[in-house]
Amino acid sequence: MRITHTSVHLGISRIIVTTLLVVGGLFGGDASAAHFTVFESGQVRPLALSPDGKLLFAVNTPDNRLEIFRVGNSGLSHRASVPVGLEPVAVAARTNEEVWVVNHLSDSVSVVRVNDEGQGGTVTRTLLVGDEPRDIVFAGHGRRRAFITAAHRGQNAPFNPQLTTPGIGRADVWVFDSDNLGNTLGGTPLNILTFFADTPRALAVTPDGTRVYAAAFHSGNRTTALHEDAVPDGGEAVGGVPGPNTNYAGVPAHETSIILKQEGQEWLDSLGRSWTSKVRFTLPDKDVFAINATANPPAPVTGPGGVFSGVGTILFNMAVNPANGKVYVSNTDARNDLRFEGAGTYAGTSLRGHLHESRITVLGASGVSPRHLNKHIDYSTCCAPTPNPESEKSLAQPTGMAVTSDGSTLYVAAFGSSKLGIYSTAALETDTFVPNSANHIQLTGGGPTGLVLDESRRRIYVLTRFDNAISVINTTTRQEIAHLSMFNPEPRSVVEGRPFLYDARNSSSHGDSSCGSCHIFGDFDSLSWNLGNPDLDVKANPNPIVPNLPEFGDDPTFGQNTSFHPLKGPLSTQSLRGMANHGPMHWRGDRNGGFTAPSAQPNSGAFNESEGFKQFNPAFIDLLGRSAQLPPEQMQKFTDFILQVAYPPNPIRNLDNVLTPAQQAGRDFFVNTTSFFHGACGACHTIDPNGNPGEGPFKGFFGSDGRSSFDVSTFFPRVPHLRNAYQKVGMFGTPVVFGKQPIDPFMGDQIRGFGFNSDGSIPTLFNFGSGFDFDPIQNAVGIPNTPEGHTIKKNMEQFMLAFDTNLAPIVGQQVTLTAGLAAVAGPRINLLVARANAGECELVAKGRFGPHEAGFLYAGGGQFTADRHDVGPVADAHLRAAATSNGGTLTYTCVPPGSGVRIGIDRDLDGALDGDERRAGSNPADPLSRP
């Protein structure tokens, strides 16, 4: 069933209704005509019940709203839809009347007042937190304290993230007193706790509210890449790269780095050889942290039970057993310390069909106990057509969980299987459970991300992300009894293509793996993998190459073999974000359309991103173990979807888009000063926000225009973009010389084993930049070996961490205006207006004036357009005055260009404005329902 809306007559303050009448028909059109920006944010806690169990709250991530449902014995009925921030991923109910929503892209938390038994709601406060917040729980005395996970960075964070400092924790938990949020712009936290891990995700709280658990997201697995300069040349026979060192035809591979895993105090390769003396850091792999929620202020738990290590590689969600206090962590564990894809005929080894394991790890007084959910799989066999008896017993990518009040049963959402799994907690804890499809509940929608138990009604409510809907499950019959669709503004190509990224039942013969196993929610896994295939041939490289400066000759390859050898060595997992308009794919550019047509920008030959992505189809067989490649029509749908996924704004760059002096100095050198054979850094790492202007919202080059270039690497690389450099901070300590920089001493504990470059073996951008130091023989135009040269490299590091991307840093930012916050909110609104005037975002304002909902879109020139045709252009000052009188609230949000009409004034893009539809009794969330 579709969501319906109760008709509400829209009234507005006297200040607004006296303005001029807007011309009708200005925003006519349909949803397919407007650009929808796909961020593919991973939901964490998408559902919550009110404490009295009468209301169900759901995040509508693509529509940037909180949906409110009335819960009854006969099912769910929709009551209200409340605009919040961009990409809401988690919700928690503090009381029956107050709900908090975590907005992943807006770096904010919306405090929503629910009224009229769920018939309406409004944002009364917007809290500003660190970058990419993900989860929220209430704990402490009276559950007054809100705990929120966020990355240790972001423009709203009141600290220096120290991105270039070793040994810094990068997992933050913000804590607010819900009864005393303060009068500052973004709220005043009680504390910001920082833990020694990379970006966090999930939270869990004990039933008594005294202890909160926080988990890292990409927590790692104690693996790293040892730079190829630290590995002897000549292959396994001389102590170098483990063999085979040729392909099946005997063609020697180039030298590469190697992947190591820390076992105790030793760093070992896949042959068990020790490289400990070469590694300049250790990885403690701290994964889950306990917090004393009642301390003043809340503080980490010290001593036993304070930190848990070795929980998993990618940690999704957590749940606490209310009966025994044990913590369950849904996770996947990567096997990237092993090698190769394909059948393994020549090498005798392969990861095909067994690259990850889906697990629930049990934490308790006895320690950390991982439980492989698919222990029935016979990994010695591969590639049977699906479905098959083995694959149907599997559960892939476990995410949200819920435990019954007596602690006896655990329900888990298997995101990659479109099922719920049911486990006896006793059997799970003792590892005596037997995988059985009889303990699965099939879901009509795909991609379940979260669930809540309604034990009094014997129901489970599950959010299914593939179709943006809610399934209702009868726990007695273990059957889905209802499925309610939420309004979804995503284009059909996104909805139809998304499952091919995540659906393990369709992707792998064992039913346990998908592309999304490594490309977590369309991004990366912060690991490197050696996925060469020695059973394959060497292939020619058709990609265009960046030319040299004339004084360095006319051979841009400098005689290097540019071919694609099938033994490529370790390479970092690349994000699937932002691939449109950036040419060939993979670090070498070996996925390209270069043999389909002459190469020319845009979209011809090697620059045809659609054709390039389709070259990944063999990986369904060679890596995931599928019986066959995807049929062409399915691969086309996958391609159409994935090329729309976008990068978020850069969280290091100032919100006004003005670089700091150091960043600007770094950019000036990067763009203008020759430091290598091609010229300046920007000769290869192209920065052109208008590159290929005909590509519309996908235009622009942000560190690469898709060409390859010579860079003194052992293979010939495609020039990589630099939009996500800030995500790779956390590895420090190198055993090799870069330029004139000495080898690092032992650097102690670090949070990441992979850094920069194609294989992740370069710890910092400063190390990378030092590779372009002046050398009279190797690089006579290099960066001077002087204090000034050192400063240049430091400045370039700062610039690259704040690198240009498709969206300006202001996109997603928001603030709520009320009478009590007018003084602090005013300057932030001024900033949002200024950036909208600069064309960096479209500014919308949503809220209430008395009992009436209202929406506005900034039209430029200091004027807003209302969501009613009988309300004329509204001056900025008049709108602010209206919001601060008579108890009004108005939340301003900078939204991506092209989405302002939909988010601000015409939700379904049917040409009938939302306010007009509410007055007429038609549905603003149904393009077929018009006044």
Place the predicted regions along the sequence by residue:
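Beta-propeller blade signature
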Residues: 163-180, 283-293, 348-365
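Periplasmic c-type cytochrome electron-transfer domains
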Residues: 153, 213-216, 220, 224, ...
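Short coil/turn segments that connect the beta-strands within blades of beta-propeller domains
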Residues: 52-54, 96-97, 143-144, 208-210, ...
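A short beta-strand motif characteristic of beta-propeller blades
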Residues: 34-38, 45, 77-82, 122-127, ...
